Regions:
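Membrane-interface capping segments at transmembrane-helix boundaries
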Residues: 154-155, 264-271
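C-terminal binding/interaction regions
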Residues: 3-8, 120, 124-128, 228-230, ...
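Transmembrane alpha-helical segments in multi-pass inner-membrane proteins
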Residues: 194, 200-249
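Small-residue-rich segments of transmembrane alpha-helices in multi-pass membrane proteins
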Residues: 49-59, 97-109, 129-130, 173-185, ...
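Short loop segments and helix-boundary regions at transmembrane helix junctions
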Residues: 32-115, 211-223, 240-242, 266-268
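Transmembrane helix-bundle core of multi-pass membrane transporters
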Residues: 3-15, 71, 87, 91, ...
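Membrane-helix/interface signature in polytopic inner-membrane proteins
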Residues: 147-180
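Loop-to-transmembrane alpha-helix initiation sites
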Residues: 16, 65-71, 92-96, 134, ...
Length: 271
């Protein structure tokens, strides 16, 4: 018989659980606005830019790659927003160009001399290797994000509903775009090592998309998204322990199952 509590005997599992309980609510919360603002490509591009952030850290001799990833991601996010707001080319095209270029540069630098193998774990992530220092980073970004959400949510929501009307109400639309992009960049970069570059975007999008299938108002939209995100994270961690598979992909599998269930039964729920 399977002992469903044996995983709690290990310190690294407790550390992983702490990280998941801190960051998954942010995935659920920020994901709602990412879906509303149709920024799925943007968050995906940020995830892929992590390789370049690490490469910059290697070239500059920065010992903590988290710092180089965060700095590069913030610059990358601001640059995308700036060019996207001024260019006549579609936003998706601009993001694709920047993302492809960023990944290529990162791969070129990291693969020089055949050393890329030691960075391959970033593709699928490894939450079990998270450190107390990295959890500290997550706690800081959690507090900052919650404070931002409490103070600026109404502005963000107004911008999503009608951008021109928000400007007429003297809401700092451009500033909100920049701050939101920076927060997404920080959350993505500080989570990338344990979630994985290939699937980080799924954890931002799937809980919010699932919630949208069920919710009938904004409160439900946020609550369901956070619940789905936390549930996927915790169950993914536990099941990955017993099935001996990577935690990141398992979390995404569970989140995907939730999405399909809510997609097919969401209409009945709303009725």
């Amino acid at each position: 018989m399977i002992d469903w509590t044996s995983w709690m005997d290990y310190g690294f599992m407790k550390m992983a659980l702490a990280a998941i309980l801190i960051i998954t609510p942010l995935f659920g919360l920020m994901g709602t606005m990412i879906v509303n603002k149709k920024m799925a490509y943007f968050s995906d591009a940020l995830g892929h830019s992590a390789l370049t952030g690490i490469a910059v850290g290697v070239v500059c001799g920065i010992p903590d790659t988290n710092i180089s990833m965060v700095i590069f991601a913030v610059v990358f996010a601001l640059l995308l927003n700036k060019i996207g707001s001024r260019s006549t080319v579609s936003t998706d095209t601009i993001i694709s160009v920047f993302s492809s270029c960023s990944v290529a540069i990162g791969l070129a630098i990291l693969s020089k001399g055949g050393n890329f193998s030691k960075y391959s774990s970033l593709l699928v992530g490894d939450v079990l290797s998270i450190t107390k220092k990295e959890i500290g980073y997550l706690v800081i970004i959690f507090i900052v994000t919650i404070l931002f959400w409490i103070t600026c949510f109404n502005w963000l929501n107004a911008i999503c509903i009608h951008r021109a009307l928000a400007k007429s109400k003297r809401i700092p639309v451009q500033l909100m775009d920049y701050v939101f992009a920076i927060l997404v960049a920080l959350i993505v970069m500080l989570s990338i090592k344990w979630v994985g570059i290939l699937i980080i975007n799924a954890l931002l999008i799937l809980p919010a998309a699932s919630s949208r299938n069920l919710s009938v108002n904004m409160r439900e939209y946020h609550v369901f998204s956070i619940i789905f995100s936390v549930f996927s994270g915790v169950m993914g961690l536990i099941l990955s322990y017993y099935t001996n598979v990577a935690t990141g992909p398992m979390i995404v599998i569970i989140a995907s199952v939730i999405y399909f269930v809510t997609y097919f039964f969401g209409r009945k729920w709303k009725e």
